[in-house]
C-alpha cells in the first residue's frame, strides 16, 4: 500500500527544493537503496541503471546540464524516498553528446541502443 499523501508531498517538496538548489548530493540523498534511473524513450534502448552506477555519473551531469525536457519520479513504498527517476531529453543531441561525455568523464562508451522492431 502506498504511503499517505502527506509523506509523498513532503518528499516531493524536498525533491523540488533540491531541484532549485541544483545540487547532486541533495538529489541523491532522496534516492532509495533500490533506486533506478531510466532515460526515455524506451525505444532508444538505454539500460535502466541502479543507484550505485548512476550516482557518480549524476554528480558530473548536474555540473553541466541545466534542464530536461521532462522528468518522472516514483516514490518508494514508504513514500519518503524516490524509487525511480525517468527523464526525457533531446535524443538527436544525445547521439552526438553521449560518446563525448562518456569519454571525457572516463566512463567508456555509452551502451549501444538495441534495434527496435519495425525501425
Curated annotation (Swiss-Prot):
Please explain the role this protein plays, according to its UniProt record. Answer: Part of the ergochrome gene cluster responsible for the typical purple-black color of the ergot sclerotia. The ergochrome gene cluster produces several ergot pigments including the yellow ergochrome secalonic acid and its derivatives, as well as the red anthraquinones endocrocin and clavorubin. The pathway begins with the synthesis of atrochrysone thioester by the polyketide synthase (PKS) CPUR_05437. The atrochrysone carboxyl ACP thioesterase CPUR_05436 then breaks the thioester bond and releases the atrochrysone carboxylic acid from CPUR_05437.
> What are the inducing conditions?
Expression correlates with the formation of the sclerotia and thus the pigment production and is directly regulated by the cluster-specific activator CPUR_05433.
Q: What is this protein called?
A: Ergochrome gene cluster protein CPUR_05426
Biological pathway? Pigment biosynthesis
Amino acid at each position: 500500500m502506498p504511503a499517505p499523501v502527506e509523506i509523498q508531498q513532503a518528499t516531493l517538496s524536498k525533491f523540488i527544493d533540491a531541484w532549485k538548489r541544483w545540487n547532486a548530493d541533495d538529489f541523491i540523498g532522496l534516492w532509495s537503496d533500490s533506486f533506478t534511473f531510466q532515460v526515455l524513450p524506451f525505444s532508444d534502448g538505454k539500460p535502466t541503471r541502479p543507484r550505485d552506477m548512476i550516482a557518480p555519473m549524476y554528480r558530473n551531469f548536474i555540473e553541466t546540464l541545466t534542464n530536461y525536457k521532462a522528468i518522472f519520479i516514483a516514490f518508494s513504498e514508504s513514500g519518503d524516498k524516490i524509487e525511480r527517476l525517468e527523464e526525457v531529453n533531446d535524443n538527436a543531441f544525445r547521439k552526438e553528446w553521449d560518446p563525448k561525455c562518456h569519454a571525457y568523464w572516463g566512463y567508456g562508451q555509452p551502451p549501444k541502443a538495441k534495434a527496435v522492431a519495425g525501425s
